[in-house]
Amino acid sequence: ELLVKNGVKFGEAVWFKAGAQIFSEGGLDYLGNPNLIHAQSILAIWACQVVLMGLIEGYRVGGGPLGEGLDPLYPGDAFDPLGLADDPEAKAELKVKEIKNGRLAMFSMFGFFVQAIVTGKGPIENLYDHLADPVANNAWAYATNFVPGK
């Protein structure tokens, strides 16, 4: 989005509209080549995603070599795969920080998604609009569009 704002031309859809390409007339062509995987069914893509991720997760939980000695239900248990943490207390603190940062990132992405749904623009363009006219481009101004009877 930032590159497009500065004049670089991309043929791809805006990031928050990318999933809608599968519903277009031509479907979704990977790498712009219709001879590669030509996806036209959202159910087929969903099924492939479930099967592929299910196989990987099943391998991990079932005791694959990459998951040996780890608790299969604890997130972040493979936090230090290279063994760089010397102090167990510091490692435990860093694990908590990593999980909290991941939660913050997910919450931020949720904000970007809501912003894109409400305004139809990405976060960079919304930031530029807000900086240009803060009174007209903020959450309260857009919230008035959803007031019943307006």
From Swiss-Prot:
Main location: plastid
Residues bound to chlorophyll a 6: 130, 139
PTM info: Photoregulated by reversible phosphorylation of its threonine residues.
Binding site for chlorophyll a 5: 97, 115
Compartments (UniProt record): Plastid, Chloroplast thylakoid membrane
Residues reported in the UniProt entry to bind chlorophyll b 3: 41, 57
GO cellular component, one term: photosystem I
Superkingdom classification of source: Eukaryota
InterPro entries in the cross-refs: Chloro_AB-bd_pln, Chloroa_b-bind
Residues binding chlorophyll b 2: 37, 66
Protein's job: The light-harvesting complex (LHC) functions as a light receptor, it captures and delivers excitation energy to photosystems with which it is closely associated.
Description of how the protein assembles with itself and partners: The LHC complex consists of chlorophyll a-b binding proteins.
Entry protein name: Chlorophyll a-b binding protein type 2 member 2
Biological source species: Pinus sylvestris (Scotch pine)
